[in-house]
Amino acid sequence: MSNSNIHPTSLIAEKAKLGKNVKIGPYCIIGPEVVLHDNVELKSHVVIEGITEIGENTVIYPFASIGQPPQILKYANERSNTIIGSNNTIREYVTVQAGSQGGGMVTRVGNNNLFMVGVHIGHDCKIGNNVVFANYVSLAGHIEVGDYAIIGGLSAVHQYARIGEYSMIGGLSPVGADVIPFGLVSSKRAVLEGLNLIGMNRKGFDKADSLSALKAIEEIFSGEGNFAERIKQVAEKYKNNSIVMQIIDFLNQDSSRAFCRFEK
């Protein structure tokens, strides 16, 4: 490999094994038992330690940490492994930690996966192929994730859980049990609880208008009959209330999403 592909500020252990056309940007640290296969690219500030193997064409972004010891009290410096397959995209601040004696001694990631910013993959996890983990997904230890699974942002998965193939977990979901293949799982979504009356008062909105607007949204979202008709009725009833009319204007705009509503 040509040294021109390694930034001079990076620290590469002499015993590290680098394939063809490996590119290593500024301030990376590569340990002596690391193997980087052909066409791996480390953008900058990437740390790869331990007995770790990165498959060809994988791209790792700044401040990712791969192959560090597992976060468990029982860890006794056993020589465990981290194996990552080919064609993976590992974005900023992702952590993938090595296996442990209690989990087969290896954390394994397949091919063609996308791990977005801040993803954590704990010790002894087994990740399949073509999965997508959105921002800040957190996997505890010993988790198995099947091929083509998608996990939404800020979701956390309990240790030893299994996530089946082709399943999808919605964002902000705490997952404490197995998810069947093809399953769709999501936590309770945000619900409308009223108006931000304190904030409105601080910004100088008329208190009477604010309280009237609260009644108006209750009529819109909790009233009887057709939703569109309720919007028209409320617009006519409260046409002199600028707060209500601003809400009505928002409701009448095109949107690809539903509205947060009061909990039933």
From Swiss-Prot:
Single GO molecular function: acyl-[acyl-carrier-protein]-UDP-N-acetylglucosamine O-acyltransferase activity
Main location, first listed in the record: cytoplasm
Keywords from the UniProt entry: Acyltransferase, Cytoplasm, Lipid A biosynthesis, Lipid biosynthesis, Lipid metabolism, Repeat, Transferase
PROSITE patterns reported for this sequence: HEXAPEP_TRANSFERASES
Protein's UniProt keywords contain Lipid biosynthesis: yes
EC number annotated for this UniProt entry: 2.3.1.129
Annotated Gene Ontology cellular component terms: cytoplasm; membrane
Name of the featured protein: Acyl-[acyl-carrier-protein]--UDP-N-acetylglucosamine O-acyltransferase
Species of provenance: Rickettsia felis (strain ATCC VR-1525 / URRWXCal2) (Rickettsia azadi)
Species lineage: Bacteria, Pseudomonadati, Pseudomonadota, Alphaproteobacteria, Rickettsiales
Gene: lpxA
